[in-house]
């Protein structure tokens, strides 16, 4: 029971409650609209210039934005299944619990590579076979990671074009990994457990169809594009590349953060340079679906190609941007002289 003298107070309170409910309803609607907008708007960063197109995000999703037959060459080094942890992101293919889980995730990307790569052109994949650890699986051995990648590309009707082996110093590998099979004490105890070092590979896959734009090299003028003399070609044609400088890489340390669990090393610039030289023309577009800190794109721009690079991890993507910009600026400076 409210006295007549308090009726106006009650009326005022009820009006304020009504206005408050109305305001909360409008705020709720506004919040819902904003959430919908956020879902529609791409939350990732893009950088587009005349020389490169950089995308931050999951390569499987972002690659769908690349037009059909847009790339003249694809070069990348995928996450090495469960061997390394590159970031703490759920979409990171390095964050898998086993080999088969990586295979499942990677299988979604290969159709996008096939769609975006021009007919008759090359996709070069850097990889290595993976050590099987006794603590995980109860025995020591090797997993045929390169063979798995080959089989997956063949399933998408790529042509297995070639493979080259990148020689690695087994002493360096032994010092870095302390692998039982490389230790000298192993041959004293039981040599059956000793093994050779694990090299890197570059697997070359050719897309179906005819290449409509030939890549024609010449050996008469080193100042002209596509200069490839016979002595250099003999190095390229070797099934083992002995002369790759493993220390010639882009700086990466500032791209690491507290969530990185293991050592990560970017792809050697020598390897990238050789692949780009052999399988693309100046002015063509080179794609990397695991852009990292931008090694493939940096070298592409330096060699007067265009780059399309996708990277998930923000700290790597920031370095990717910087390295692409540096390459573009260096080219501009050189063109002045």
State what each model feature region is.
Residues 1-9, 16:
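Conserved RecA-like P-loop NTPase helicase motor core
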Residues 315-337:
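Cysteine-dependent PTP/DSP-like catalytic domain, specifically the C-terminal lobe
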Residues 14, 19-319:
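Core catalytic lobe of class I
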């Amino acid at each position: 029971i409210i006295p007549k003298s308090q009726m106006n107070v009650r009326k005022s309170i009820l009006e304020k409650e009504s206005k408050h409910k109305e305001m909360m309803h409008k705020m709720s609607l506004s919040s819902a609209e904003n959430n919908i907008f956020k879902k529609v708007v791409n939350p990732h960063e893009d950088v587009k210039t005349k020389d490169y197109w950089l995308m931050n995000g999951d390569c499987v999703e972002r690659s769908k934005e690349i037009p059909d037959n847009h790339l003249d060459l694809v070069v990348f080094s995928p996450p090495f299944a469960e061997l390394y942890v590159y970031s703490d992101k759920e979409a990171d293919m390095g964050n898998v619990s086993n080999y088969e889980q990586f295979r499942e995730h990677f299988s979604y990307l290969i159709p996008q590579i096939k769609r975006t790569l021009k007919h008759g052109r090359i996709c070069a994949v850097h990889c290595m076979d993976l050590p099987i650890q006794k603590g995980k699986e109860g025995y020591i051995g090797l997993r045929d990671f390169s063979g798995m990648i080959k089989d997956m590309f063949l399933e998408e009707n790529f042509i297995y074009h070639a493979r080259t082996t990148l020689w690695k110093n087994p002493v360096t590998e032994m010092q870095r990994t302390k692998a039982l099979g490389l230790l000298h004490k192993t041959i004293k105890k039981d040599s059956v457990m000793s093994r050779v070092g694990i090299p890197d590979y570059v697997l070359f896959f050719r897309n179906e169809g005819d290449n409509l734009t030939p890549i024609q090299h010449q050996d008469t003028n080193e100042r002209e594009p596509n200069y490839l003399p016979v002595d250099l070609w003999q190095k390229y044609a070797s099934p083992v590349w002995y002369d790759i400088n493993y220390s010639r890489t882009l700086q990466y340390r500032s791209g690491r953060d507290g969530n990185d669990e293991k050592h990560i090393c970017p792809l050697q610039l020598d390897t990238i340079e050789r692949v780009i030289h052999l399988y693309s023309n100046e002015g063509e577009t080179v794609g990397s679906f695991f852009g990292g800190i931008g090694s493939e794109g940096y070298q592409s721009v330096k060699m007067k190609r265009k780059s399309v690079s996708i990277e998930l991890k923000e700290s790597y993507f920031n370095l990717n941007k910087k390295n692409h910009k540096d390459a573009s600026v260096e080219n501009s400076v050189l063109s002045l002289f």
